[in-house]
From Swiss-Prot:
It is an enzyme of class 1 (oxidoreductase). The active site is at C128 (acyl-thioester intermediate). This is Acetaldehyde dehydrogenase. Its EC number is 1.2.1.10. The keyword NAD applies. It comes from Salinispora tropica (strain ATCC BAA-916 / DSM 44818 / JCM 13857 / NBRC 105044 / CNB-440). Belongs to the acetaldehyde dehydrogenase family. Keywords: Aromatic hydrocarbons catabolism, NAD, Oxidoreductase. NCBIfam families: ac_ald_DH_ac, PRK08300.1. One of its GO terms (molecular function) is NAD binding. The lineage of its organism: Bacteria, Bacillati, Actinomycetota, Actinomycetes, Micromonosporales. NAD(+) binds at S10, G11, N12, I13, S159, A160, G161, P162, G163, T164, R165, A166, N167, N285. SUPFAM superfamilies: Glyceraldehyde-3-phosphate dehydrogenase-like, C-terminal domain, NAD(P)-binding Rossmann-fold domains. GO terms for biological process: catabolic process.
Length: 308
């Protein structure tokens, strides 16, 4: 039996997520979409697909008769708006999957720590860069400690809508924190690049892990990364390594750490292409977010069904 869900936000991410629920999920049923722009393509598309809509935001959503059938809400708006949305939805007893960088609930990256948070009523999907790179930091950390993790996420400028651009500062802060909290690095840093190239390029991510053990088992690290890539590919088929993992000895002063580090640098180069459900395939940054959110919601619902 499927469980009713709603999407807050009728932009690129919200619309792609709606289509994923409709096309891919056996356990989730798309009930409603709420936005604030009555002329948005997302709301128009939802209406064409037979999904109930409102342009009155979260207030309009909870006022819909169909809201009674909604058990879980995806929030695909902005970090600032989410705090209000969470308060409203929490008061109505709804579970929330947050696709903004607000991080009201715990960070969740499905192949790394989803099992730890299945009882939560609000979970945060970090950022697109976080979903792509935190698994790699965590994979390295399963073999050897990571002192410093730095990621560079390069995304097509055309894939960055108003919501993404409004959240740029929160993107870097939230991703860096997730590198530490979920990835396990002592210190994390995140950089995002909006690539204006036309035709647009696929999402590329570079992950640097600095490890204090120069003699760490390189084969074991490479194998752990390969295993993690396969785990992500279960729900994001377009996620892949672009080349072999690189290893370099380092012995230098790191301003971010405020000290000298002698150890091993592990460099991982990733590419993410989207599934093309609603967004172009170059928007892998958005696709990995919606795919991770869908995977998370299905697991949350399954956990509740087992314990009901």
């Amino acid at each position: 039996m499927s469980v009713g869900v709603a999407v807050l936000g009728s932009g690129n991410i919200g619309t792609d997520l709606m289509i994923k629920v409709l096309r891919l999920s056996d356990s989730l049923r798309m009930v409603a979409m709420a936005g604030i722009d009555p002329d948005s393509d997302g709301l128009a598309r939802a209406r064409r697909l037979g999904v109930t809509t409102t342009a009155e935001g979260v207030a309009g959503l909870v006022a819909l008769p169909e809201f009674a059938d909604v058990a879980l809400v995806f929030d695909a708006t902005s970090a600032g708006a989410h705090r209000h949305h969470d308060a409203v939805l929490r008061a109505h007893g709804r579970t929330v999957v947050d696709l903004t960088p607000a991080a009201v609930g715990p960070y969740v990256v499905p192949p790394v720590n989803l099992d730890e948070h299945l009882r939560e009523t609000n979970v945060n999907m970090v950022t697109c860069g976080g979903q792509a790179t935190v698994p790699i930091v965590a994979a390295v950390g399963r073999v050897t400690p990571v002192t410093y993790g730095e990621i560079v996420a390069s995304i097509a400028a055309k894939s960055a809508g108003p919501g993404t651009r409004a959240n740029i500062d929160e993107f870097t802060e939230t991703t860096a924190r997730a590198i530490e909290v979920v990835g396990g690095a002592e210190l994390g840093k995140a950089i995002i690049v909006l690539n204006p190239a036309d035709p647009p390029l696929l999402m590329r991510d570079t992950v640097y892990c600095l490890c204090p053990d120069t003699d760490a088992d390189r084969s074991a690290i490479a194998a752990a990364i390969a295993d993690m890539v396969r785990a992500v590919q279960e729900y994001v088929p377009g996620y892949c390594l672009k080349q072999d993992v690189q290893f370099d000895r380092v012995d230098s002063y790191l301003p971010a750490l405020g000290r000298r580090l002698t150890g091993l640098q592990v460099s991982t180069f990733l590419e993410v292409s989207g599934a093309g459900h609603y967004l172009p395939t170059y928007a892998g940054n958005l696709d990995i977010m919606t795919s991770a959110a869908l995977r998370t919601a299905e697991r949350l619902i399954a956990r509740r069904a087992v314990t009901a």
